[in-house]
Amino acid sequence: MNAHASTAPHCRAGTSLSDSRLAQDLPYDYSTLLENVLDVSHVPYTHHLTVSNRANGGPVELSVLEPGVTSSGFSGMWLEGPRQGKLGSQSTKFVAPGLMYHSLEAKGLGTTLTVVFATPVAPGRSRLLARFPFRFNAAPPRFIIKNTPRWIQHQGQNGVLEDDVVFLAQQEAFVAAAEAQGQTYAQACFMPLRQDAYVLAFRQWLTRFTQGGSPWQPGALLAAHSTSPTRDQLLDRYWSHTFNCTSCSAALKNTRTASIVAAITGVAAALALTACLAARLILPAAALPVSPLALLAAVAACAFAWVKLQAIEKGFLVGPSIPKRNLITSKKANTSTKIRLV
């Protein structure tokens, strides 16, 4: 088709927008990936406290523009736009077979895009190639984003993808089982609202122009979901992203080195503290070369650094088992409760 020769307008060379990028392998099919990124209505709920908030949720009226769904894809418009209209209208374009982008000219804020190339890898597996071009009118957000290390940006983007992963893997297995029993996608999934217009348009394109909607042999997708993945497999970051990312793999290596240094330094400081305390017991009047309090502070600092570095290292390996949307914070008690729900 034509996506190989196409890019979103603001991604072309010579534009004035800055750009953030991400590549990640995902444990669900290319079609499920595109369906998910086209669906704007789920964002305030699934991605609560990562990139959105439930308070921004509400009716979503999407329109597929003329000439509708063609072999080249389709275009759409959300007139109200995100955050209950506070940012202005958002346009969407699907360029067959694997490119889609949302474009938002936010009122008084600037231009932001979400651009996704979805690539089939194997039945039940896909690769996301995403770009996030932006141009903010205000200087502070431009400065913050441009000066945030890429690996920190990637960990945030990993987290957004992990918000969906449990739902999407289970949804895909359900749909594959229904289709194996002779149901169509429309029979397996009830989507009567205009918020589903983009998903329905994409599924219509799959059915009309891809000889049945899947690049795989019949039954291949169902076979790919014959065993349920573990939570750690679904939330894997190392093999799905870090291993192949120059920024994140280098940061992981540096984090592990710093962790070793913190551990060795902490042990050395603890041994020195023990020696100082022993010397004080043996020779109470003798002057000590180093203050025991300074050594104790060094031990505490190294222990703190080691714990933090271990947490950073884990962020390169696997995502958190509890999504942010399931962290309920009590303002009165200033405490948080973690609920183990998908």
Q: Where in this protein do the model-derived segments appear?
A:
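C-terminal catalytic domain of Rieske-type non-heme iron oxygenases
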Residues: N2-V342
